[in-house]
Amino acid sequence: MPQTLTEKILSRASGKSVAPGDVVEVKVDIAAFHDLTGYHVIEVMEKAGMLKVFDKQKIVIAFDHLAPPPDVRSAEIQTQIRKFVKELKIPNFHDINVGILHQILLEKYANPGYVIVAADSHTTTSGAVGAFAQGLGASDVAAAVITGKTWVMVPQSFKIMLEGKPGKWINGKDVALKILGDFKADYFNGMSIEIFVREPSAFPMDFRATVSNMGIEMNADALMFVPDEETVNYIKTNRGYEPNIVRPDEGAKYVDEYTIDLGKLEPLVAAPHSVDNVKTVNEVEGLDVDQVFIGSCTNGRISDFEIAAKILKGKRVKSRCIAIPASYDLFKKAMELGYIETLVNAGCIVTYGTCGPCLGGHFGVAGPGETIVSTSSRNFKGRMGSNDSKVYLAGPAVAAASALQGKITDPRRFS
């Protein structure tokens, strides 16, 4: 029987043919955690008396949520994890100077057809290269770290086709918000979303990573882009090898199908306090903005900063603006291309590789009564700081234009 991408990956990982609804044990290709969740993962392992890993090469650890540590407790957590890394001789450890876990997985480790589990909900980001990637709780990740296995209920597969080419200032965030606006945040529960791109070059890896990252906001079990030449080129460019490609079979059965015409999209925002409270930018244009955040594992990549730099070049922001590329490699490339200089000259505060403001942790927490425009993934009440703050989610073009004007602004005003 023809299989979807989801069914193919889980069949390979379980060693038997699977169908939606099956509960199977699968081998994991990567198990990962970061500083904020790593403490709990290690605690579970210690309590079980099983402080060991199934394969040192398949464990990935990164410091990002508490990087650099904003308080003594954060520093203590990182010290404990460094000790764990040293004792177990884990090679794929990335300290506070490397980047956000999900970006690191995308840049260095994830491959088409992989099963990836990590102790963070935005693990779905690795679906951009066609990996079945899920965020799990600390106990399940601890079990995967020890045994190299986890259990999965095989989800139904939902097919989305992207047609055409996106217009100016449109990127992956607008596609993610389009899906959330049309289907709402609970529609895809128990499903895996598989996205096909009719013209692969029209929707590059940066855009795909944003959409996959927000798969968890759609309550999808996974969100994967079907691998194509863009996938191959990305991995070959970043890692120097050509990956094996896994694609669904012709005639595979999907629970439903949906098409998005990229050429018809306009800039979208998610208004407070829900990711599916989606509006066109024109519906909220003119609202005063106190702070703008451009970055995170959702929109902290080169194309995001290219867009922001084009809008901000030679100008000064009117709102506070924080810009955080998702990794050191991205920060360095953005410097080489002049984007960091442009943002700094425009009055932005720039660092790299920290989750900081996204989770209301540090480096730009929202105060009472403040309105934030953010390229991150969530706008729940209190997500970025005060419960009395409001967060509007948007792509980098809306964010940069809003920082420039000090109010929510349609970027199409800038040619």
UniProtKB/Swiss-Prot annotation:
Q: Which cofactor does it need?
A: [4Fe-4S] cluster
Family statement: Belongs to the aconitase/IPM isomerase family. LeuC type 2 subfamily.
GO molecular function: any one? metal ion binding
Question: What is said about its interaction partners and assembly?
Answer: Heterodimer of LeuC and LeuD.
What species was this sequence derived from? Sulfurisphaera tokodaii (strain DSM 16993 / JCM 10545 / NBRC 100140 / 7)
Pathways involved: Amino-acid biosynthesis; L-leucine biosynthesis; L-leucine from 3-methyl-2-oxobutanoate: step 2/4
Which Pfam families does the record associate with it? Aconitase
> Per its record, how is this protein called by name?
3-isopropylmalate dehydratase large subunit
Q: What are the recorded Gene Ontology BP terms?
A: L-leucine biosynthetic process
